A protein has these predicted regions:
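Juxtamembrane intracellular "pre-TM" segments in multi-pass secondary transporters
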Residues: 2-14, 197-229, 415-418
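Short amphipathic helix-loop junctions that connect adjacent transmembrane helices
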Residues: 38-55, 244-261
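Central cavity-lining transmembrane alpha-helices of secondary-active solute carriers
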Residues: 60-76, 268-280
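Conserved MFS/SLC helix-loop-helix module at the cytosolic interface between two early adjacent transmembrane helices
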Residues: 71-107, 285-291
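Hydrophobic core of transmembrane alpha-helices in multi-pass small-molecule transporters
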Residues: 99, 111-124, 316-330
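Cytoplasmic helix-loop-helix junction between adjacent transmembrane helices
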Residues: 115-153, 338
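Symmetry-related core transmembrane helices of the 12-TM Major Facilitator Superfamily/SLC fold
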Residues: 176-192, 383-399
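Helix-loop junctions on the cytosolic side of multi-pass membrane transporters
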Residues: 188-205, 399-410
Length: 418
């Protein structure tokens, strides 16, 4: 697809919506991730007013956001189908801006945890963006569209921590929250001005359907429960190493740089390969089917974790994690394209709201599982556990391929395919 084609400015052109949402996703990803590097340090600076241990509160600032997002995302998804997906994109960015701005005025670590919980309740930008793009992109281009959104979030999450760390060093922690809120408000303006969404008359009937009925309908679509299981496994696999990688790198000898710098390099390189591969594998999914791409990427990723059990030098984990990033770049947008193809037109909000809740559940559980495996067995055993998770994802995808043929792209007909 040529760039000049993507930049067609007609109001009803899906490519224009995709380009606007791509930049909005990039901006919001930078904004949300600027606070990641120093949140535990900010917790220590604020201190506790209730006597709770700072180690517990440092973990709670992450888990609280994931928990509330898991609980509220399905409701936001249904509301998106009823009242418009553009409105939900604006709501998610504005809600994130308000909650993060308030964090600059927190007076205790407990207040910060509550505000992070509020952020989880009000935000959910990625799922809102996915639902909007899935509702307008033609079936044959869903893989490309989801790949582009993955690129936007990948670049944003790679740049954000670097920007946040520099601002925190130069101007203090609280300034970062002001900058983040400003970036999210810019995304709000970008979507308000640049995105045009026309309400489909056929969707009005869904406004009288109860939340539970909408969710039941979504789960009853052939293949959707399997797609959600894939999302949970992918989220679990993606986040399992988060508490382990820094500790494992410290255990390696003869590093050419500090452990902190090398940890950042490993994470950054993996994110970079994920971002680059997402666009190419997304386009490939449009041609051969998202199931096939997810299957191959999951199986290869599973195999790549086996040699990581035997790593003895830093360059080895750097190389293998870079290759893992390529696989993840095909899995994440591939599952989004698969889900878009399995859900009916007009139900994208509900489908991706549930999807975001399941992803948040995986993010919440993964660090606990990774830590438990490390305690019960060893740090190296976590790599094998990760390989098993991706192997299960590959087996499940293979079962989907055998059960139902199709390319997993979104369609505008009554019978779901994918």
């Amino acid at each position: 697809m040529r760039l000049d084609s993507l930049l067609n400015l007609e109001k009803d052109n899906w490519k224009r919506t995709l380009v606007i949402i791509f930049f909005a996703q990039l901006t919001s990803a930078v904004g949300f991730s600027t606070i990641f590097p120093f949140l535990p340090l900010y917790v220590a600076e604020l201190g506790s007013t209730t006597g709770l241990k700072l180690e517990f509160l440092a973990g709670a600032v992450f888990s609280a956001q994931a928990l509330t997002m898991m609980l509220t995302s399905p409701f936001w998804g249904v509301l998106a189908d009823r009242y418009g997906r553009k409105v939900m994109v604006v709501r998610a960015n504005a809600g994130g801006a308000i909650s993060i701005l308030l964090m600059a005025f927190a007076q205790s670590a407990e207040q910060l945890v509550l505000l992070r919980a509020l952020q989880g309740m009000l935000s959910g930008v990625i799922s809102a963006n996915n639902a909007l793009v899935a509702s307008v992109a033609p079936r044959r281009h869903t893989g490309l569209a989801m790949g582009l959104l993955q690129v936007g979030s990948g670049v944003g999450f790679a740049l954000g921590p670097l920007l946040g760390g520099m601002i925190a060093d130069w101007y203090g922690y609280r300034t970062v929250f002001y900058v983040t809120a400003g970036l999210l408000l810019f995304s709000v303006l970008l979507v308000l001005v640049g995105v045009y969404e026309e309400k489909d008359p056929e969707e009005k009937s869904s406004q009288r359907v109860h939340f539970l009925q909408v969710w039941k309908q979504a789960f009853n679509r052939t293949g959707v429960p399997a797609a959600y299981t894939l999302r949970f496994l992918a989220s679990l696999g993606r986040m399992l190493l988060v508490p382990i990688i820094p500790l494992f790198i410290v255990s390696l000898s003869a590093l050419s740089m500090s452990e902190n710098t090398f940890t950042g390099l490993v994470v950054g390189v993996s994110s970079a390969t994920t971002t680059v591969s997402a666009i190419f594998l997304g386009r490939l999914a449009d041609r051969v089917g998202s199931r096939k791409v997810v299957l191959v990427c999951a199986m290869l990723t599973s195999l790549l974790f086996i040699p990581q059990f035997f790593i003895t030098e830093g360059w080895q984990i750097l190389l293998l994690q870079a290759l893992v990033g390529i696989g993840v770049g095909g899995i994440t947008p591939g599952i989004s394209a698969l889900l878009a193809g399995l859900s009916l037109h007009g139900e994208e909000g509900a489908a991706f709201g549930l999807d975001n809740a399941i992803d948040a559940g995986g993010r919440m559980v993964a660090p606990l599982v990774g830590s438990a495996v490390a305690v019960w067995f060893s740090l190296r055993a976590v790599f094998l556990a990760n390989g098993v998770i991706y192997l299960l994802a590959g087996v499940l995808t293979g079962w989907l391929l055998l059960k139902q043929k199709g390319n997993g792209s979104r369609r505008r007909v009554s019978a779901p395919q994918g």
